[in-house]
From Swiss-Prot:
Compartment annotation: Secreted
Listed name of the protein: Caeridin-5
Organism encoding this protein: Ranoidea caerulea (Green tree frog)
One GO process term, biological-process aspect: defense response
Superkingdom of the organism of origin: Eukaryota
This protein's UniProt keywords: Amidation, Amphibian defense peptide, Secreted
Record's GO cellular component terms: extracellular region
Length: 15
């Protein structure tokens, strides 16, 4: 994601 730490895989915010 944009600020993704984990959700980057889903292209989310990674919260």
């Amino acid at each position: 994601g944009l600020l993704g730490m984990v959700g980057s895989l889903l292209g989310g915010l990674g919260l």
